[in-house]
Amino acid sequence: MNDLRNIPQVDKIIKNEAFSGLDTSLVTMLARQILDEVRAKILNENASFESEEIINLILDEYYKFNEASLQRVLNLTGVTIHTNLARSVIDKEILKRATPVITGYSNLEYNLKTGSRGNRYDYVGSLIARAFGFEDAIVVNNNASAVFLVLNTFAKGREVVVSRGELVEIGGSFRVPEVMANAGCILKEVGTTNKTRLNDYEEAISDETAMLVKVHRSNFDIVGFSEETTANELSELASRQNLIDYFDLGSGFYGNLPFNLDKNEPDLKNLKDVSLVSFSGDKLLGAVQCGIIVGKKELIAKLRKNQLLRMLRVDKVIISLLAESIKAYLNKEFELITTQKLLHKSVKELENLANFINKSLKTPLEIVRTQTFVGGGAMPNKKIPSVALAFGGDANLNELKFRQKKVIGRIENDKFMLDLRSLLDDDVETLIKIINETEEK
């Protein structure tokens, strides 16, 4: 068919039995789109199309349209908090506990005792504060929002003192200096890239100073000839000068981390004297995406009054899942925090898992010891021991074959590898099945 007169009309083509049972309005929309493309190709390229071919083009677009854009993948990169693969995983038990609230009406902003309007942050705020030892807390949609809200609330139009070595950029071109400017603050840099002492901050304080800010360099490190001021030292200086001190912790963790990961890493339990601290919920904490701000009660109260909070607030889904995750910490149910569970797996456990998988494969794979990273922009210079299954043959071809099966691995030393550090327990049998199916072809 290369004659425009032979192109079927939309109302006729959608009556084809191939579209029986499908959404008529969507089929109609896609039919118009495909027929326009067919006309253009006939005119511009002298292309030829058969009716059956046009029907198949419409069907292909229909099923693509209905396929979920977000799809389940198996993370075999070894990176536990993989930003591109949605960071921390929520345990099914956490989801189960939160489900009654998520799937029904709730007292999100209703006080059951008084029968009047309530505040969505009261419960989760007190829960976080109790868990981590702070006076109060508030939650926004991510840590970038937390940084912006804190700066805008307490330092708009005034000076913010920060170390030159902490003016970082994280993923998505999020740059601290630009965020400060957009929040209405005046940036005052102190120290040098590799050294910033307490007296550098002290000498920079003026009548226009509102805050002393520390930013954790979570996604890079300065080694060698370097020196920095701790958050607690900055807090003491701020207290003497009647200023607010704020620590953008970034990843943030509480408790213990394996493989010496917590060495020189600021722990929430050691920051209780800092006026305000913010961190991500879906990184080392292992909960949902959000930004958590903890600190002095009177300062959190001022944050709640900022009109920006309505634009940055979280919904009942985030609050419910976060609350259940925090309760797991309080109850020492660390096995329900998937990120912590994966990071704490020993090399021996991973080797046992590799052997178990190999016994179920038609063709056993090479088991290799390797190293990986935490991910999520945290601890970039700290490697974690791990165990992987390595494939022979063309590494790029193997990577493509498994990616098409929604199994994401990595290439190392010219071999395609499936790193078991990030493999979820529920995905083991699925992985075995996919390996066997893929290796048969």
Swiss-Prot record:
Main localization category: cytoplasm
Enzyme class per UniProt: transferase
GO terms under biological process: conversion of seryl-tRNAsec to selenocys-tRNAsec; selenocysteine incorporation
Molecular-function GO terms, alphabetical: L-seryl-tRNA(Sec) selenium transferase activity
Compartments in which it is found: Cytoplasm
Disulphide bridges: none
Pathway info: Aminoacyl-tRNA biosynthesis; selenocysteinyl-tRNA(Sec) biosynthesis; selenocysteinyl-tRNA(Sec) from L-seryl-tRNA(Sec) (bacterial route): step 1/1
UniProt-listed Pfam families: SelA (PF03841)
UniProt xrefs under InterPro entries: PyrdxlP-dep_Trfase, PyrdxlP-dep_Trfase_major, SelA-like, SelA_trans
Annotated catalysed reactions: L-seryl-tRNA(Sec) + selenophosphate + H(+) = L-selenocysteinyl-tRNA(Sec) + phosphate
NCBIfam families the UniProt entry points to: selA (TIGR00474)
Protein name: L-seryl-tRNA(Sec) selenium transferase
